Amino acid sequence: MSEQQMDLKDLMPTKRKYMWKTAEDRRMSDLTCVLEWLERRQGKKKQAPEKQKPKVVTVLKRNKKKEEKKGKGLMTARGGNRRDTETSQQALGKRFRKDAASYRSLYGVEQKGKHLSMVPGSYIKDGPKKSDTDIKDAVDPESTQRPNPFRRQSIVLDPMLQEGTFNSQRATFIRDWSNKMPDMAYERKLKSLMEKSTEPKMETMRMLKPEEVLSCRYLRLSKENIRTLLKLCKDAGMNVDIHPHMVEEDIDAKKVFTGIPSMAL
């Protein structure tokens, strides 16, 4: 019985995994697990390319053999077309050389060994440096070839030249103005005639009769207007039955004008 008890005790764990471990122990155990996993992963990565290398080499060797066989077959089949291909290649090479030469001459590309430099010849360090006199000589013909027509008058230093240019301009301006003067006068006359013909003729204002004034529906008579009407009627010798306090609706032309209605004021 004692032996069986001892065996059972050996089988049972003396520690529980999570109860007696501190936080530091747990952290360290996690770190060790992570490190082991990383080592395993790196070892797998290193082994993978080593295993794949011989396969690639064998595949390349097979492809090379196939290409060599194909090339031999093509050479035997296209034996008669070799000369045509060579002539076409020579023509292409000549054309390419011509294009390269024209490109260099246009854009200033100079050849240095195998490489081409895009820097123009005037800015290359190894090239011959131009002196100040050469630069001035190159600038002078450009300035003479391209005269600026919009140059300011202040650039001319000699006052006599300035006076001559101004006098010539004045003379040309006066000539043009004198030639245009009769045309301008003629145009003014034409404009005045056209305006006179288009102007509406002013008609003489016709004096309204009191009957017409009072029979207007939309007329609002003020006190002053009614007074003036009364004066006009009295001056004309008409007896008018109207007073300033009357409303427009109360005014009736037939009752107001009992005398001669056709008589003008």
Swiss-Prot record:
Biased composition (Basic and acidic residues): 126-139
GO cellular component: nucleus
Pfam families for the chain: DUF4638
Span list, region Disordered: 62-94, 118-149
Coiled-coil region list: none
Highest taxon, organism lineage: Eukaryota
Identification of the protein by name: Uncharacterized protein C16orf78
Annotated organism of origin: Homo sapiens (Human)
Gene that specifies this protein: C16orf78
